[in-house]
């Protein structure tokens, strides 16, 4: 069920100021966004924030990016914008559709490219930076951030220029309350991206199911409070009751804190229980999309509760346009990848 998030002027102004400071936005900056103004990153992050800072902004039609993704960075090059944004799928869509010739773009003026609004993939960020090596784009410009509508927009940002920092952790460690330590072997692990520290005016904690704050590297519920956080949902008292705990908003995400910042492992409601362990759909999808010939964004993982109601039956959906006979081999490779990556 869709829920309306109520934001006050105080919420918006607090977060706009915090975003401006955290990203070190100055008078020499300018922005480019293809995200619609019906999206909080498009409206608040790349329309209201530039207005607040009195800097130029370029708005690109979303449909144009979908149909002709090359126009995105061509437009950035044309207007020499310094701040760009895209959810993770946008980087995949660009790389899948565009071949960048050496010398065809000059992106040396780009200071930050925000990556948010959905889970951030470290491998996608690395590939994007590698593809654009010849454009003058600094890999440290890639800027993974964390936020949600209930926080107006932003919750945590890394230090500008720090690039994409990640941590590989064992899949079996990603259960509530577990201490999550770096993986000693590359097998059966997932790479999580560091999403920085809370922006000014926003507090963040990681708690267990009883609301007790957990220590660093302990996986739990990500909760927030602050001037930027909504006071509740539109005409939905039950939603407010479910979301707010002693003044803290439960984001619905699971994650852990470290000295480097916040790491989010996934949505609490999306966790699958298979073979006695918790699994996150996006981790399995990410592993399958590394298979040769598998198209980005064409894999979805879900689950169906078993008849015994004891665990979930894993379901993998793949968009496949060739003849069905060819799919048999693809199914075998998917099974092999699941066994190798996660023992499923």
Predicted regions and their residues:
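Active-site glycine-centered loops adjacent to acidic/histidine catalytic or metal-binding residues
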Residues: 1, 117, 147, 196, ...
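Conserved AMP-binding A3 loop
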Residues: 1-14
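Conserved AMP-binding/adenylation subdomain of ANL enzymes
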Residues: 13-30, 40-82, 97-102
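Thr-Gly-centered strand-to-loop micro-motif
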Residues: 33-34, 60-61, 115-116, 207-209, ...
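AMP-binding/adenylate-forming catalytic core of the ANL superfamily
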Residues: 77, 84, 226-232, 242, ...
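Conserved ANL (AMP-binding/adenylate-forming) active-site segment centered on the GW(Y/F)…HTG consensus within
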Residues: 130, 172-192, 212, 228-252, ...
């Amino acid at each position: 069920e869709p829920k309306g998030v109520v934001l006050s002027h105080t919420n918006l102004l607090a977060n706009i100021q915090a975003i401006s400071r955290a990203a070190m936005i100055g008078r020499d900056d300018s922005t480019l966004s293809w995200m619609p103004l019906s999206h909080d990153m498009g409206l608040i992050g790349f329309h209201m924030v530039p207005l607040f800072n009195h800097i130029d902004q370029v708005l690109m039609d979303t449909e144009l990016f979908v149909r002709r993704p090359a126009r995105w960075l061509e437009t950035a090059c044309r207007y020499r914008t310094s701040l760009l944004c895209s959810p993770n799928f946008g980087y995949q869509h660009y790389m899948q559709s565009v071949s960048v010739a050496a010398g065809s773009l000059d992106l040396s003026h780009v200071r930050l490219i925000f990556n948010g609004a959905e889970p951030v993939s470290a491998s996608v960020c690395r590939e994007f930076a590698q593809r654009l090596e010849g454009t003058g784009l600094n890999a440290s410009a890639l800027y993974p951030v964390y936020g949600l509508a209930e926080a107006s927009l932003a919750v945590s940002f890394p230090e500008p220029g720090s690039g994409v920092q990640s941590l590989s952790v064992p899949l079996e460690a990603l259960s509530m309350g577990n201490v999550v330590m770096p993986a000693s072997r590359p097998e059966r692990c997932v790479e999580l991206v560091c999403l920085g520290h809370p922006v000014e005016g926003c507090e963040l904690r990681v708690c267990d199911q009883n609301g007790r704050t957990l220590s660093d590297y302990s996986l739990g519920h990500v909760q927030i409070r602050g001037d930027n956080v909504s006071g509740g949902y539109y005409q939905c008292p039950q939603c407010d009751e479910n979301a707010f705990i002693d003044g803290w908003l439960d984001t619905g995400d699971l994650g852990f804190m470290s000295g480097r910042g916040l790491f989010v492992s996934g949505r609490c409601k999306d966790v699958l229980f298979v073979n006695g362990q918790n699994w996150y759909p996006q981790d399995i999808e990410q592993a399958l999309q590394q298979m040769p010939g598998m198209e980005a964004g064409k894999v979805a993982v879900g689950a169906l509760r078993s008849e015994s109601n004891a665990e979930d039956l894993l379901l993998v959906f793949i968009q496949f346009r060739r003849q069905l006979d060819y799919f048999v081999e693809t199914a075998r490779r998917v099974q092999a990848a699941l066994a190798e990556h996660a023992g499923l």
